[in-house]
A protein has these predicted regions:
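Cleavable N-terminal signal peptides of Sec/SRP-targeted secreted and luminal proteins
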Residues: 6-27
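Structured domain cores in non-transmembrane regions
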Residues: 29-32, 37-45, 53-165
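Extracellular low-complexity, O-glycosylation-prone Ser/Thr/Pro/Gly-rich "stalks"
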Residues: 36-37, 75, 85-92, 98, ...
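Conserved beta-strand elements of beta-rich interaction domains across eukaryotes
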Residues: 53-57, 158-160, 248, 305-309, ...
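Thrombospondin type-1
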Residues: 90-91, 261-333
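A short, structured loop/turn motif at beta-sheet edges
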Residues: 143-149, 175, 291-294
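Short beta-strand elements
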Residues: 168-185, 318-328
Length: 333
């Protein structure tokens, strides 16, 4: 007859095995996305329109006006399934993402996508022309297959250390139905490979590289950062994408387009972002000057670091004076 101790040990072992099985049952893979399978019977044709909203009214702080002025790189888009990620917030940037975010070079990014296409995890790659201004439009047509219904894209901000906008694994299919229209507001991301704080910062590699992070009005929490707006709860969208499904007959299929839309299309309007004045610390007090009979006066100054814009807080006084006793008078006392 087995002792109660042996029975207890056996029961604990069985419980442990059950718990381990449950863990493996519910712990799915980390990178692949769950619930993204598309069961549509045929591909869908879309037109993708990228719109830049990067204006001195919405983003007045350190707005790039020349060498080079604010502009957008070419757009790189990839259709894929759940086993591929072009980029992902909270993870390190690949070599291709780094080179594109820092330099606008697409060679390694496209090479990785082509290799993934051989493994049938990437469907197709698309691109649009760059936009020479902060405000503008570009577009391309896409033919999305059910087996690769996710869309990821990137556009580099020029100039910037390693900043970009984009979407990660946007699903254009829901069950067996293609979505008719999708609009997404875009915000800046930091690739984590360059430590520059401003649009025109010199090259300053981050060592070791950090994860891709979203830039907000409060992060990075440093006054020197070009997107630091402490009065704002969140930044206005700096760009957006609109994806519209197109009807397409089997007999006539127009060629894929890759063009900049005319400027006659009205850009989306956002309220102007207030930019408060920023001043330096006070200098040291100057010499106390004046006759001993009336007492002396000393001065100190500060200077403007950032001029206000869009009804931001005006600059305070830049010079201050106070009464004092001249040093020569103290010697006679």
């Amino acid at each position: 007859m087995m002792s109660s101790e042996h029975l207890t040990c056996g029961w604990l072992q069985q419980l442990l095995l059950v718990l381990v099985k449950l863990c493996f049952t519910f712990a799915g893979p980390l990178r692949p996305l769950i619930g993204t399978e598309c069961t549509a019977k045929s591909p869908a044709s879309y037109i993708l329109v990228f719109t830049g909203h990067w204006s001195p009214q919405a983003f007045p702080k350190q707005y790039p006006l020349f060498r080079p002025p604010a502009q957008w790189s070419k757009l790189i888009a990839v259709s894929h399934n759940r086993h591929f990620r072009l980029w992902e917030e909270g993870t390190p940037a690949s070599a291709g993402v780094q080179h594109f975010a820092e330099l606008g070079v697409t060679v390694e990014l496209m090479k990785a996508a082509k290799e993934a296409r051989k493994k049938r995890v990437v469907g197709a790659m698309y691109r649009t022309a760059g936009i020479p201004n902060g405000i503008g439009h570009s577009s391309t047509e896409m033919l999305i297959q059910p087996r690769s219904s996710l869309l990821s894209l990137m556009v580099k901000m020029i100039p910037s250390p390693d900043w970009f906008v984009g979407v990660d694994s946007l699903n254009l299919c829901e069950g067996n139905q293609w979505k008719q229209e999708v609009t997404v507001d875009l915000h800046p991301y930091d690739a984590g490979t360059d430590s520059g704080f401003t649009f025109s910062s010199p090259n300053f590699p981050t060592s070791p590289p950090e994860n891709i992070t979203k830039i907000t009005s409060q992060f990075p929490n440093h006054p020197a950062n070009s997107f630091y707006y402490p009065r704002l709860k969140e930044l206005p969208p700096i760009a957006s994408i609109r994806i519209m499904r197109q009807s397409r007959s089997r007999d006539h299929q127009s060629p894929m387009s890759n063009h900049i839309l005319p400027n006659s299309i009205s850009p989306q309007r956002f309220s102007a972002t207030p930019l408060d004045c920023e001043v330096s610390l006070w200098s040291s007090w100057g010499l106390c000057l004046g006759p001993c009979s009336r007492g002396g006066v000393r001065h100190r100054t500060r200077y403007i670091l950032l001029r206000p814009a869009n009804a931001g807080t005006p600059c305070p006084e830049l010079e201050e004076q106070s009464e004092c006793v001249p040093h020569s008078c103290m010697q006679h006392q």
